[in-house]
Each structure stands twice: as structure tokens, then as C-alpha cells.
């Protein structure tokens, strides 16, 4: 039996214990720090993903589907349906429906303000009348005297005169000196006076614009008078402002509109015509003599269409007053005051019914 026995090398008990210690090595803090250094951020992220995918609550299909959705930042059909239901229950906030000055006319069912109107294609204004253009002081004085004599011959107590001004503008230096005055008392003729060579306005021109029968009108005309006074102190802006008519303000009174008007929008609204407000001409050198054909036509159309707008608003005002008088005769003064207290729009509707 001894021949089948295998002799093992003699070892001490201490040696066996040391062997076991070598096999089972304890991790020291230094060793864990080294392992942490070996793992890059990318490897750590992959480990976290694998740990999340290997949870017992998730099956294989669920793990792959959810992880891919998380990485691609996509929504499942269920999540999309939930979002749609939430949006339908909580719609986005709308703008305030508070009635303002610009929307008051639309709220009353009246004429929309110029800002609310949809743009439409309108025919351009074509002026075929005469254009009388002067650059020298004596010529301007003679022309202004002729116009003043024509005004005095008119039977009307008030003679409307369209008034406008032009001047050069630079983004570096700002507005230049008043260079052009254009007027129109008859739709068949426009007068253009270039002031470049003038140090002082002719007395005949000052007398014309201050004539008691002349009613100057335009859009934002008060600002023109103030600039004219700054450039030519012999003109009194306050005296001209007292008797002038701003067409935009007058339109709001007659047509029950709101907001601020430009001459271009007034032409669209009142005359159903479009104006060619080319920036090339509008920002051109108005102080250079002579003015070219495009500049002359631009200046003439501004006062021509202003005169047309004035005549149209004047006729509308006469019609409105006539309707009010007829309503008073048929229904009495008390009924008229009661209806007017309800608003101008209501009164205009009543006038349409009675007519």
C-alpha cells in the first residue's frame, strides 16, 4: 500500500497560512484609487448603463427600448399622446382683448384703423396738371403774389391750400435746412418754391400763408411749421398752427377711425390710390438746384393728393351734418341727444336707416 502513496513536501503550518494570505489579497485604499484612475469617464458611463439595463424589473426588450429612447431623447407614442392631451386642456395664452384707441373702431363694427387694414394693390396716383417751379427770390415773390390775388377773388370765406415741405437728410448730420415749399390751391396746378438761394423768405410768400382766407392743411403739418420757423425766423409757427388742419386728425373725426395717419395711408383709405414713396427720391438732395423731374413730380403729388383728400373729407362732413339735421327734424332734439350719447357710430347707422 505504501507504493501508492504520494509523498507531499513537508510544509509548516505557518507556510500554509502565508499561502492562503497570498491567494486572498485585501484591497487597500491605495489599490481602489488606482482602479478608479484606470476607468475613464466614458467607461464609467457604460458601466452605469449596463447596471441600469441589468435590473431585475426590466426584461430584455424593455431595457433596449428605454435605453435607446433615453439616448436619442425621443418620446414614445404614449408620452406624445399625453403631451397632446395636456396642451389641449391648457391652451396657450392669447393676447389681451382690451379695447384700445387703435382697435376701438373695429370693436364698434366701424371702419378699421390704418394699421389693421390688409394691404391691397391700388392704382398709383397720376398727376397730369401743371407744375410751376421757381428758385429765385423775385420769381417766388411774384408767383406768391399771383396766388394771393387768386385767393382774394374766390367767393368762399375759406380757401383750402395744401402745404408741404422737403429738406435733405443725412444719417451723419441729421436734417438739413428747409429746401422746398410746395403748395396747391387748385388740383390743376401745383407751385414748387426752392429755398436754397434764399436767406430770407419773400414777404409775399409769408403774406400768402398767413392770409385770413387761406386754410393750410397737410399731414403732421404742425411739425413743418416749427421747422420752417427754426430755419426762417420771420415765420411765426404759432400763428400758422392756430388755423391749420391736420388731415389725419380730421379723418378720425369724420370717419370715426383711430390712430395716426401718414399721407400715403390717407390716400389709400380716402382716395383708394397708392403713392410712389420711393426712398431714392424721398431721401434725395432737395437743396441741389435744379430739381429733376422725379423730384418735381414727387413734390407736386404730395400737395395734389392732399388737396383731393381735403375736398373729400369736406364733402363727407357736409353729408354727416345734413343727416344729423334731418334726424333732428324727424325725431326731435331730445332724441338726437339720446342717440348721440350712445355713440357716433350708432348715430351714423340711424342716419342710414332714415335715408
Curated annotation (Swiss-Prot):
Localization (cell) = Nucleus
Q: What molecular function terms (GO) are annotated for this protein?
A: 3'-5' exonuclease activity; metal ion binding; nucleic acid binding
Query: Which parts of the sequence bind Mg(2+) 2?
Result: 164
Residues that coordinate or bind Mg(2+) 1: 164, 166, 302
Can the keyword tRNA processing be found in this entry's annotation? no
What is known about what this protein does? Has exonuclease activity on both single-stranded and duplex templates bearing overhangs, but not blunt ended duplex DNA, and cleaves in a 3'-5' direction. Essential for the formation of DNA replication focal centers. Has an important role in maintaining genome stability.
**UniProt-recorded name of the protein:** 3'-5' exonuclease
Q: Which gene encodes it?
A: WRNexo
Amino acid at each position: 500500500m505504501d507504493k501508492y502513496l504520494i509523498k507531499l513536501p513537508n510544509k509548516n503550518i505557518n507556510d500554509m497560512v502565508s499561502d492562503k494570505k497570498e491567494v486572498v489579497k485585501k484591497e487597500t485604499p491605495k489599490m481602489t484609487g488606482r482602479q478608479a484612475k484606470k476607468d475613464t469617464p466614458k467607461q464609467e458611463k457604460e458601466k452605469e448603463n449596463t447596471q441600469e439595463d441589468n435590473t431585475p424589473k426590466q426584461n430584455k426588450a424593455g431595457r433596449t427600448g428605454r435605453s435607446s429612447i433615453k439616448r436619442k431623447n425621443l418620446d414614445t407614442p404614449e408620452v406624445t399622446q399625453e403631451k397632446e392631451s395636456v396642451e389641449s386642456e391648457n391652451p396657450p395664452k392669447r393676447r389681451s382683448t382690451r379695447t384700445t384707441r387703435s382697435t376701438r373702431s373695429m370693436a364698434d363694427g366701424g371702419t378699421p384703423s390704418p394699421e389693421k387694414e390688409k394691404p391691397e394693390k391700388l392704382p398709383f396716383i397720376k398727376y397730369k396738371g401743371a407744375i410751376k417751379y421757381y428758385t429765385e427770390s423775385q420769381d417766388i415773390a411774384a408767383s406768391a403774389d399771383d396766388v394771393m390775388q387768386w385767393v382774394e377773388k374766390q367767393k368762399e370765406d375759406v380757401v383750402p391750400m395744401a402745404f408741404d415741405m422737403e429738406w435733405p437728410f443725412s444719417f451723419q448730420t441729421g436734417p438739413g435746412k428747409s429746401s422746398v415749399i410746395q403748395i396747391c390751391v387748385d388740383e390743376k396746378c401745383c407751385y414748387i418754391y426752392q429755398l436754397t438761394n434764399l436767406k430770407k423768405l419773400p414777404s409775399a410768400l409769408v403774406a400768402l400763408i398767413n392770409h385770413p382766407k387761406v386754410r393750410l392743411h397737410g399731414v403732421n403739418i404742425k411739425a413743418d411749421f416749427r421747422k420752417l420757423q427754426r430755419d426762417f425766423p420771420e415765420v411765426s409757427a404759432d400763428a400758422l398752427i392756430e388755423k391749420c388742419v391736420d388731415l389725419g386728425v380730421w379723418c378720425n373725426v369724420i370717419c370715426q377711425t383711430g390712430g395716426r395717419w401718414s399721407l400715403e395711408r390717407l390716400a389709400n383709405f380716402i382716395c383708394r390710390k397708392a403713392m410712389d414713396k420711393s426712398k431714392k427720391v424721398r431721401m434725395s438732395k432737395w437743396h441741389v438746384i435744379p430739381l429733376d423731374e422725379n423730384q418735381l413730380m414727387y413734390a407736386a403729388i404730395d400737395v395734389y393728393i392732399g388737396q383731393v383728400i381735403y375736398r373729400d373729407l369736406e364733402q363727407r362732413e357736409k353729408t354727416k351734418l345734413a343727416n344729423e339735421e334731418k334726424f333732428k327734424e324727424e325725431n326731435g332734439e331730445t332724441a338726437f341727444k339720446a342717440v348721440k350719447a350712445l355713440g357716433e357710430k350708432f348715430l351714423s347707422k340711424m342716419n342710414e336707416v332714415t335715408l
